[in-house]
Amino acid sequence: MAAPTQLPETAKPKHSNQSEAGPAPLASPTAPMPRPASHLAPMPSDHPDFRSKSARLRCQPPRTNNCGTFKQPPSVAATSRPKPGNPFLQPPTKGTPPPKKKKKNHTEGCHTHEANPEPNTKHTETESPKPQTSTQHHTPITIPSSLLSQNTQREKRGLPLLTSRPSTIPANTYQPQSPHIHSHTPLQRPISTALLHQNLHIRARNIRHTGRLHGSPTKGAQTAQQAQPHPPKQLATL
């Protein structure tokens, strides 16, 4: 049986044993540091990815204080740095605030019931009772004696009583009204003298007619004479 041939040492594979070749060369300092095997492992502070993007662009480490936070200008740090504890409970830093003005008590300078036992009627004098306010703008109603005597006669006959409101149009005459013109508003258009005499004549005739209906022709004639002191002239043709 032939003995196995031995290969020269130069022909041996390099990966069989690297310890014989000596220690491996060290990595260059400029080469990036490899990431840790696990993404949960803490990243070393000198790793280039640990720095912020702006710091990497500037190629310098970030300015940090002892707590590890970024430094701020003194003006910004003075205003934005939170104070320890509750800021609302701390005393003011710059001077003392002016003393608050004492709120004026309502009883000071006023007449109270304890100091003045008499009731204060200062505010009640201007108020007027309700029945007076309802009738203060109306004129008092005066009923003439002649109207009272007529009402007593009408009560005996069972007729409705007369009111003291003066009415130019008798109750038994029909007066058509337009829906836009009220009876209490006077007409604004001018009236000629002929129409005025005609209206007076018709009014006197209506008063005479109502006086005869009520059974007192003399009173009807008197009221007609009062309404028309002069005899009507002949109507002019329009």
Curated annotation (Swiss-Prot):
Which portions of the chain have biased composition (kind: Polar residues)? 129-152
Where is composition skewed (Basic and acidic residues) in this entry?
106-128
Q: Where is this region: Disordered?
A: 1-154, 211-238
Q: Please, which domain of life does this record's source organism belong to?
A: Eukaryota
- Family indicated by similarity: Belongs to the UPF0328 family.
Q: What is this protein called?
A: UPF0328 protein ECU07_0010
